[in-house]
Regions:
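Basic- and aromatic-enriched surface patches that contact anionic nucleotides/nucleic acids
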Residues: 2-22, 26-37, 47-173
Length: 173
């Protein structure tokens, strides 16, 4: 029988992602992850989905500290206290790019910006209230406490490679 992984479903505000990153607790570049592959158009479309309330897939993370606390010892000491992103790197990177001023979105999408007439804005162009409103958007997370990078990779591969790209058809139908 396959062991159940027991991922916990949570909703967290976007600000938690920034907090984890700024504290050095967010691991976006695990060995099984690809690099940053989303272009500007895809990033903007994702942000529009997020801001308009379209459900987006949950981000899958591994709470390595929780795994270590439960007796897992297969992580290097420097990595034992991090949240490793198993699935959702492109989404979280896009959010952080916006917050950090590296991605601009149409100004008409936001009510609270420092320049009311700005055609394009990033998180650094929002007022304190505007940034708080954005940062309080909730995102779904699936949180695991897997004991090793190998188990993280297994989940990553099941989520990303077990299906077909849209438009493809299985040959064994």
């Amino acid at each position: 029988m396959l062991p159940r992984l027991n991922l916990q479903q949570t909703n967290r505000p976007i600000d938690v992602v920034r907090h984890w990153r700024d504290a050095g607790d967010l691991e976006l570049n695990t060995p099984y992850q690809r690099g940053d592959v989303w272009g500007k158009a895809r990033r903007i479309a994702f942000m529009k989905s997020l801001l308009t309330g379209i459900p987006i897939p949950s981000v899958i993370i591994n709470d390595r500290f929780g795994a270590t606390d439960r007796g897992a010892t297969q992580f290097a000491e420097a990595d034992q206290y991090k949240y490793a992103v198993i699935d959702g790197k492109q989404r979280l990177t896009t959010i952080l790019m916006f917050v950090d001023g590296e991605l601009q979105l149409p100004g008409e999408w936001f009510d609270h910006k420092t320049d009311p007439d700005a055609a394009m804005v990033s998180g650094t162009d929002l007022t304190h209230v505007g940034l708080r409103l954005f940062s309080n958007h909730a995102m779904g997370f699936s949180e695991a406490t897997l004991p090793s990078i190998e188990r993280e990779r297994e989940v990553f591969e099941l989520v990303n490679f077990a299906g077909l790209q849209q438009g493809q058809v299985d040959t064994d139908i």
